[in-house]
């Protein structure tokens, strides 16, 4: 039975609109294309998520390089697919969110164990593909599959699966209650064991809680509020709109993307570390998702200035060259993510002379953050009830009966079933969010005219600062990085500093002489940065409640166990999306998609490791889980 046939059976019997089908094994390219075509033609209110669990195998590259599949995903010819053969989840969104395809690559067991449980069991059907890795099938794996499944989950085998694999799969499925030879048999004992496994997983998630909002029926929908106006909040509005949510975005400016998302050009490339740690892994998956968002919006006809011309990353002094070398050789990077290049290659790619080799990010490039922001929100308005309130500075927020109300100097808004604070440099302005651990850094980006040899620059350069190829006859370079600087006026000294960074990075190159900052053209704003450089996404921690519990369980032998097993307190139905730093174009869209999934109680496209990495309470909970002391001010 194919996934398409399973889906039809589930649609015929299910009343809820969200359907999740999971498949063990990559399956065939033809079957996946058939499913996408059927979903594009299907007139239905159902939203389908297909989760494909596959080891990283040679056939995967056939999927990644298939132009017809890429065109189906984006609805536009000559589009490349933003997928890479890396471990973890990569989400592709098709047909305005009516079909989501999650590729979970790597060990079956590891990928299943890392799935966050947002609600109870959520998988409606399991399909065993004919190219599954039979050697990975065992009882422990099938218990993981059963834990994630509804009790009435369908279990199906591809008819081309070998007889041995069929027999093994059916036997293991029967042992965990996924399959029975008797048509109406329900094994309550097995269902109880599956429920116990879910409860255990929920408890393991307790320190970094996943908190769906109490969503109301569509006919009684009071909507979701977002405070923001930049690329992250616009992408969040789009992700919520793809789930048929009613969204209101409150922006204090007279147009979208007037703050940190207002630069003329921003670079898109991942943050990599030599050991490819959790942060590095998140940035790779976020990078691919952001590229997919960008391409899809452009394919939909939204005007976005961008060029995925690649990014050349080199050192600028002995220390940074060693750092780049460590990143280059510390991990076997997938070629779609990063390639080691020599100086001659770097020069050929960049179109200007470079003396250093380094890393090349072939899918990266630059985009207009303003265009990206507007396109995301315009698309949200095109597919759902998304409204925008400009010139509306929200000065206060408060909750009553688990719904949220917002206040400006002249008006009151609400109720809203959920509220997301995503207003960049102002995320800490409310009493509920004042202790969120993110710091503002002023950044000035310089604009210089494109001329002479400088005009030949054909890739984004990243060394001590960055520089973009020209757009509308201007290059962007920068940016300055000044902590806690509230003044956002133009700085002549930072303009010169930006020039010196490029001069220092590419000493002796004649094209540097064509960089002219004397026009005093620049843009200044503040970006919020976290100590660990990870974005902040999830429920807002209730710090007063955390500190009250801390006083009761302070540094006792049992204190670590308490925090490991009790859900960390949060403000109900209040969330934050921020702390994106200087790479929000890369990290923001996936964080927004994951938050929208969490709010709506749907499968998240990130692992449990990423949930804890991004959780807004992480700085406090890391200490508590290690039995370390907190300062009672809450700012530790």
Curated annotation (Swiss-Prot):
Claim: Oxidoreductase is one of the keywords in the record: yes
BP GO terms, sorted? methylation; tRNA wobble uridine modification
Record's InterPro entries? FAD-dep_OxRdtase, FAD/NAD-bd_sf, tRNA_MAMT_biosynth_bifunc_MnmC, tRNA_S-uridine_synth_MnmC_C
**What GO molecular function annotation could you give as one example from this UniProt entry?**
tRNA (5-methylaminomethyl-2-thiouridylate)(34)-methyltransferase activity
| Protein EC | 2.1.1.61, 1.5.-.-
Q: Which residues cross the membrane?
A: none
Which residue stretches belong to region FAD-dependent cmnm(5)s(2)U34 oxidoreductase? 227-636
Q: What is this protein called?
A: tRNA 5-methylaminomethyl-2-thiouridine biosynthesis bifunctional protein MnmC
* UniProt region (tRNA (mnm(5)s(2)U34)-methyltransferase), positions on chain: 1-202
Q: Which Gene3D superfamilies match?
A: D-Amino Acid Oxidase, subunit A, domain 2, FAD/NAD(P)-binding domain
Query: What cellular component GO annotations does this protein have?
Result: cytoplasm
């Amino acid at each position: 039975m194919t996934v398409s046939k399973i889906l039809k059976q589930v649609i015929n019997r299910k009343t809820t609109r969200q359907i999740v089908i999971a498949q063990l094994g990559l399956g065939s390219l033809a079957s996946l294309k058939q499913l996408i075509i059927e979903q594009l033609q299907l007139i239905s209110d159902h939203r389908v998520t297909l989760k494909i669990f596959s080891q990283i195998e040679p056939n995967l590259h056939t999927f990644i390089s298939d132009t017809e599949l890429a065109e189906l995903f984006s609805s536009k010819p000559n589009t490349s697919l933003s997928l890479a053969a890396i471990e973890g989840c990569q989400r592709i969104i098709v047909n305005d969110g009516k079909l989501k395809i999650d590729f979970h690559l790597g060990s079956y067991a590891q990928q299943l164990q890392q799935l966050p449980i947002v609600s109870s069991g959520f998988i409606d059907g399991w399909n065993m593909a004919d190219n599954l890795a039979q050697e990975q099938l065992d009882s422990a794996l099938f218990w993981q599959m059963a834990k994630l499944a509804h009790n009435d989950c369908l279990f199906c085998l591809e008819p081309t699966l070998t007889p041995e694999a069929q027999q093994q799969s059916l036997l293991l499925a029967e042992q965990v209650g996924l399959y029975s030879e008797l048509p109406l048999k329900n094994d309550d004992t097995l269902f109880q064991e599956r429920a116990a496994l879910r409860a255990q997983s929920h408890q393991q998630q307790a320190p970094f809680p996943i908190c769906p909002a109490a969503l109301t029926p569509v006919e009684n929908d009071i909507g979701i509020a977002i405070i923001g106006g930049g690329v992250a909040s616009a992408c969040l509005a789009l992700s919520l709109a793809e789930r048929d949510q009613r969204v209101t975005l409150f922006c204090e400016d007279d147009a979208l993307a007037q703050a940190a998302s207002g630069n003329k050009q921003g670079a898109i490339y991942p943050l990599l570390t030599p050991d490819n740690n959790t942060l590095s892994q998140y940035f790779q998956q976020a990078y691919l998702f952001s590229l997919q968002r960008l391409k899809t919006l452009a394919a939909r006809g939204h005007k976005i200035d961008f060029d995925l011309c690649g990014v050349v990353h080199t050192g600028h002094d002995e220390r940074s060259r060693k750092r780049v070398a460590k990143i280059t050789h510390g991990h076997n990077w997938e070629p779609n993510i990063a390639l080691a290049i020599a100086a001659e290659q770097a020069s050929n790619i960049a179109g200007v002379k470079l003396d250093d080799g380094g890393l090349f990010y072939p899918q990266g490039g630059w985009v207009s953050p303003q265009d990206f922001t507007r396109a995301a929100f315009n698309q949200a308005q095109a597919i759902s009830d998304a409204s925008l309130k400009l010139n509306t500075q929200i000065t206060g927020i408060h909750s009553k009966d688990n719904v949220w109300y917002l206040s400006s100097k002249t008006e009151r808004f609400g109720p809203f079933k959920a509220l997301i604070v995503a207003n960049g440099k102002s995320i800490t302005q409310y009493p509920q969010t004042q202790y969120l651990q993110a710091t503002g850094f002023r950044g000035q980006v310089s604009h210089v005219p494109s001329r002479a040899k400088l005009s030949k620059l054909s890739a984004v350069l990243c060394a001590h600062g960055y520089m973009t190829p020209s757009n509308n006859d201007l290059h962007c370079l920068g940016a300055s990085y000044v902590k806690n600087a509230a003044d956002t006026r133009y700085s002549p000294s930072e303009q010169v500093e930006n020039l010196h960074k490029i001069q220092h990075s590419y000493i002796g190159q004649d094209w540097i002489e064509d960089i002219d900052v004397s026009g005093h053209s620049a843009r200044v704003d503040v970006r919020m940065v976290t100590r660990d450089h990870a974005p902040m996404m999830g429920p807002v921690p209730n710090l007063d409640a955390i500190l009250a519990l801390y006083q009761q369980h302070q540094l006792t032998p049992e204190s670590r166990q308490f925090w490991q097993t009790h859900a960390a307190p949060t403000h109900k139905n209040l969330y934050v999306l921020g702390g994106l730093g200087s790479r929000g174009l890369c990290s923001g869209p996936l964080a927004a998609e994951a938050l929208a999934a969490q709010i709506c109680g749907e499968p998240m496209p990130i692992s449990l490791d990423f949930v804890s990495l991004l959780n807004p309470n992480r700085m406090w909970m890391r200490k508590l889980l290690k039995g370390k002391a907190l300062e009672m001010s809450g700012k530790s």
